[in-house]
Regions:
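Transmembrane-helix motifs of polytopic, lipid-linked glycan transferases
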Residues: 81-102, 116, 139, 143
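Membrane-interface alpha helices of multi-pass inner-membrane proteins
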Residues: 49, 111, 143, 155-170, ...
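Short helix- or helix-capping micro-motifs
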Residues: 20-21, 110-118, 163, 167, ...
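Specific aromatic-rich, kink-prone transmembrane helix
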Residues: 93, 113, 133-149, 155-163, ...
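Transmembrane-lumen/periplasm boundary regions of multi-pass, lipid-linked membrane glycan transferases
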Residues: 165, 174-275, 289
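Short acidic/glycine- and proline-prone juxtamembrane loop motifs at membrane-interface regions
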Residues: 119, 125-133
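Membrane-interface transmembrane helices that cradle and orient dolichyl/undecaprenyl
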Residues: 99-105, 140-156, 190, 263-271
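Transmembrane-helix signature of polytopic, membrane-embedded enzymes
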Residues: 13-15, 94-116, 135
Length: 638
């Protein structure tokens, strides 16, 4: 049975499937290009520097892209070839599912055409780990179709291998695993749970995740903290109506009748009762992803099944109304042609088609995102997935200009630091064109890469990092430029570029605690209290003057936690320790001043806010507090 599944047969159906899949690749290669998307540059950077010792991200997506980059070189076209190839494989599995549902050549072609212009279209021109993940989902769903049709139960081993690869691609495959597990209980095939093969497949799937899980365990489960922070920082949680709308518009509103018909067949039609599992699976996925705050596109591959069912139904409808001797070809041709024509107006919302100035005018009547949001980041004139393709080369050029100026005036080797992984990825991609060193960043994969390389320098050109953070690390922070672009994401626009010199601490040791404060210091603080933690800090500094136990932001956040709990004295002690550790950061004086005000120590609060404004004359909050304190002290001079 396994041999039968994998054996290549050059039948007319196979040629049709290959033709539609190839057309999908060609479509994305002939489309115009706006430039690299933020996510794509991140995968390029990880692929270029890939190491199994840095599994901040599951390895399949960067390794898959690395294969294309090694064979064909670095370019946007190559990245989109990798993406569209994944889309082509999803289409292949969708067409095979239509065939297993009883579809003949017309249904197979319809399924392919429907999927080319479905919600998958955006992923053909935007590479991310969703692309290979969708292939895994689609392959697993095809295997389950075969199982439901009575194939050998040993196919669960194949499903397990696919899901194991999925675990090393993107952990959202767990949604599919849960949906499969629950949906099987709702059909007669629940008896499969009495047999060993399904459990063997599940075991193989979880074994596949072991390398990633073990790496995360060794690094303090960094992914969990990062995912939580990222979700709270950017991910948009949709109300139920928005979530349902997101299943319609991004998936092509013209496709709605097709997949709804497919869903109805799978759920309610007696002739389709053998495949009822997929109707339940869709409902479980919808409910689970919505309740857990997942993105609407996580379940995109399940639509290949619904579309295949809808296409087979259309074929059967025509068959019942046609004369075998005089088949009605014109109506059959009109269906895919009408679908493509109805799909074209929505295409500019999802893939690069129009010149950018025309695109801005085109999307304006319906709203920039047409009611579809995946992130809570501010947007301007373009949807987020379009705006994130603009400005990166110009940003790298601006940083390179400051870098060249700094090299001509500095005796030190100058490095480049970026505030987030998007900026760092762009600087990596364009470093060769502008003759820059490899950037570092405390965000995502770049954090661990910098820890491993330990190639820290004395001076840095920085972009995307706040002045207060830079001042806590460097004695001199000079603003040298500002990056602007008319079409980039607003949170990347008007981004200051600094030249930082006079390193005040050991950057390698600072980097090691930049994600999580020193564990020994944290344990003392939690178990023995603030006073003992302050003593511990001084003891460590006496033993090692270069020791760094926390960042200014970490201790600041902790101090505010104590302040919110009305533990004012302890918060003051923590803020004072922060002032001692980072005396040239204006922010630490602001925080200490606020705690002293809460403790009615107004004169000392005035001293700290005064120092804060001296360090940063643009500190509006500090100036406001100074005015308040002057009034308070005038009324209560004692």
């Amino acid at each position: 049975m396994l041999k039968r599944l994998t054996r290549l047969r050059l039948t007319p159906e196979a040629l049709l499937i290959a033709g539609v899949a190839f057309a999908n690749v060609v479509l994305h290669l002939v489309l115009p290009e706006y430039g690299y998307h933020r996510d794509e540059m991140y995968y390029v950077a990880i692929a270029d520097g890939f190491s199994f010792s840095n599994l901040d991200m599951p390895p399949v997506a960067p390794l898959y892209l690395k294969l294309f980059l090694m064979l064909l070189g670095h370019s946007v076209r190559v990245v989109h070839l990798a993406a569209s190839a994944c889309g082509a494989l999803v289409i292949v599995f969708g067409c095979l599912i239509a065939k297993e549902f009883g579809g003949k050549r017309y249904a197979i072609v319809l399924t392919g055409v429907f999927l080319v212009f479905s919600g998958l279209v955006i992923f053909g021109s935007l590479y991310s780990y969703d692309d290979p993940s969708f292939v895994v989902w689609s392959g697993a769903l095809y295997v389950i179709v075969r199982l439901l049709k009575g194939s050998d139960q040993r196919l669960w081993v194949v499903a397990g291998i696919l899901l194991g690869i999925g675990m090393l691609t993107k952990l959202t495959v767990l949604f599919l695993g849960l949906a499969v597990f629950l949906s099987l209980w709702l059909i007669s095939e629940r008896t499969w749970y009495r047999r060993p093969w399904i459990w063997l497949g599940a075991g193989i799937a979880f074994i596949g995740a072991l390398p990633y899980v073990l790496w995360q365990r060794a690094h303090g489960w960094y992914f969990l903290s990062y995912a939580t922070t990222y979700a709270g920082r950017t991910t948009h949680e949709s109300p139920v109506l928005d979530f349902l709308w997101n299943q319609v518009l991004p998936n092509n509103i013209a496709l709605l009748p097709v997949w709804l018909a497919g869903l109805a067949l799978l759920l309610f039609n007696r002739e389709w009762s053998r495949f009822r599992f997929f109707g339940y699976c869709y409902l479980v996925l919808c409910g689970t992803i919505f309740c857990l705050g997942g993105q609407f596109y996580f379940m995109m591959p399940i639509y290949a099944v619904l579309v295949a069912a809808g296409a087979v139904w259309i074929e059967q409808w025509f068959a019942m109304r046609s004369n075998p001797e005089r088949p009605r070809l014109v109506p059959r041709i009109c269906v895919p042609v009408a679908y493509v024509l109805m799909s074209l107006p929505a295409l500019p919302f999802f893939v690069p088609v129009l010149p950018v100035d025309l695109l801005v005018r085109y999307v304006k009547p319906l709203g920039v995102n047409a009611g579809v949001k995946t992130e809570d980041r501010q947007i301007a004139e373009l949807p987020q997935h379009m705006a994130d393709r603009f400005g990166w080369e110009e940003m790298a050029r601006s940083v390179a200009e400051v870098y060249r100026q700094s090299q001509s005036t500095s005796h030190d080797t100058v490095g480049i630091v970026a505030g987030n992984w998007g900026e760092a990825s762009a600087l990596h991609v364009y470093r060769g064109a502008f003759d820059m060193p490899e950037p570092i960043s405390g965000d995502g994969w770049f954090y661990f890469d910098a820890l491993q390389r330990q190639a820290f320098r004395e001076s840095y050109v920085a972009i995307g990092v706040s002045r207060s953070v830079l001042q806590s690390v460097f004695r001199h922070v000079d603003r040298k430029g500002v990056f602007t672009h008319p079409h980039c994401m607003p949170d990347e626009n008007n981004n200051a570029i600094y030249y930082c010199t006079g390193l005040k601490l050991n950057l390698g040791k600072y980097w090691a605690v930049s994600k999580r404060m020193d564990s020994a210091f944290e344990n003392v603080l939690r178990r023995e209290g603030v006073d003992r933690a302050v003593e511990f800090y001084h003891e460590r500094r006496q033993q090692d003057p270069d020791a760094v136990l926390f960042t200014e932001r970490q201790l600041n956040a902790l101090g505010y936690d104590y302040l919110k709990q009305s533990r004012t004295g302890e918060s003051i002690a923590l803020f004072r320790l922060n002032v001692e550790a980072y005396p040239e950061s204006f922010n630490v004086y602001d925080s200490l001043g606020e705690a002293l005000m809460a403790d009615r120590q107004y004169a000392r609060a005035l001293e700290n806010y005064t120092r804060s404004v001296e360090l940063n004359p643009e500190n509006k909050n500090g100036r406001k507090k100074l005015e308040e304190l002057k009034v308070i002290l005038a009324m209560h001079p004692g």
